């Protein structure tokens, strides 16, 4: 929140081979940097900046392991990630592993990868081209984990499309939740307005005051409530927009139910 591009530019220049990165590189809304062993994408949005790091997963962190550590394998280093300017709103580790998903044999090692915790599971695509699993929880490193399991022949294009939609879906879900504190802050004022309205109605029915007096009090009550809601109008509008985007990304993934498993869509509802 309120992070200047200059601070982001200086931080990006600390990456390997990026010391000469020109400030003008951040004039647009999108930047992709090629790094030793991977790449980083920088995106500027209306309310947030997204950093997406692409890199191979070490061989010893795949299916068959339990709660494998991931931060220590980052090609940019955990200190660089933790020093990204601004407040962290969303932190996700998305891992794509290859396995045969024609049967459900992959489910047991995939659950083990999450340490046996309860997870949501869905098949994706009309033809069930991949499967996704997540527990929607923050791991010890402060990141939420999403596991995608896809056949070995999955193309880079399809892998990228699946990953992007999942990351956007969860990002928009968490951004939509920014409206929750505003709703909680407004709740006492709404409750007070309801009590005042109830009292006004009772006075009107009992003819305890003139119609004009009651009308003036009603107008004053309405004005106060309108001021309170106007203060949070942007946040609530943004919440509705983010929720619509989240639902759109989920629909684009065309998830399918696995017998006996809670789907991502069911959890999100």
What are these regions (language model features)?
Residues 34-39, 128-135, 239, 261:
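Short small/polar-residue motifs
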Residues 1-98:
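N-terminal pre-transmembrane cytosolic regions of membrane proteins
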Residues 12-16, 23-41, 177, 184, ...:
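Non-transmembrane, interaction-prone segments in cytosolic or luminal domains
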Residues 5-9, 159, 171, 211, ...:
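Alpha-helix initiation and N-capping motif
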Residues 19-23, 172-173, 179, 200, ...:
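Short secondary-structure junctions and interdomain/linker hinges
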Residues 54-223:
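Extended alpha-helical interaction modules
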Residues 216-269:
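Membrane-associated alpha-helical segments
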Residues 5, 15, 19, 155-156, ...:
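Short, structured coil/loop segments at alpha-helix boundaries
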């Amino acid at each position: 929140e309120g992070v200047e591009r200059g601070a982001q530019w200086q931080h990006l220049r600390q990456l390997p081979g990026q010391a000469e990165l020109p400030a003008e590189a951040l004039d647009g809304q999108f930047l992709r940097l090629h790094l030793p062993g991977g790449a980083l994408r920088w995106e500027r949005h209306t309310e947030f900046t997204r950093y997406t790091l692409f890199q191979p997963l070490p061989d010893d962190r795949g299916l068959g392991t339990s709660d494998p550590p991931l931060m220590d394998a980052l090609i940019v280093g955990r200190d660089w990630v933790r020093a990204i300017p601004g407040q962290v709103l969303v932190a996700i580790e998305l891992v794509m592993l290859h396995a045969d998903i024609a049967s459900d044999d992959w489910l047991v090692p995939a659950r083990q990868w999450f340490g046996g915790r309860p997870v949501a599971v869905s098949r994706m695509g009309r033809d069930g081209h991949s499967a996704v699993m997540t527990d929607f929880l923050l791991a010890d490193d402060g990141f939420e984990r999403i596991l995608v399991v896809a056949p070995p022949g999955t193309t880079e294009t399809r892998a990228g499309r699946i990953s992007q939609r999942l990351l956007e879906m969860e990002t928009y879900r968490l951004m939509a939740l920014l409206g929750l504190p505003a709703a909680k802050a407004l709740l006492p004022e709404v409750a007070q307005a309801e009590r005042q309205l109830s009292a006004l109605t009772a006075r009107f029915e009992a003819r305890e005051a003139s119609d004009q007096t009651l009308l003036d009090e009603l107008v004053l009550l309405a004005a106060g409530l309108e001021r309170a809601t106007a203060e949070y109008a942007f946040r609530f509008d943004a919440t509705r927009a983010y929720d619509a985007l989240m639902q759109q990304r989920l629909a684009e993934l065309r998830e399918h139910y696995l017998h006996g498993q809670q789907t991502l869509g069911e959890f999100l509802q």
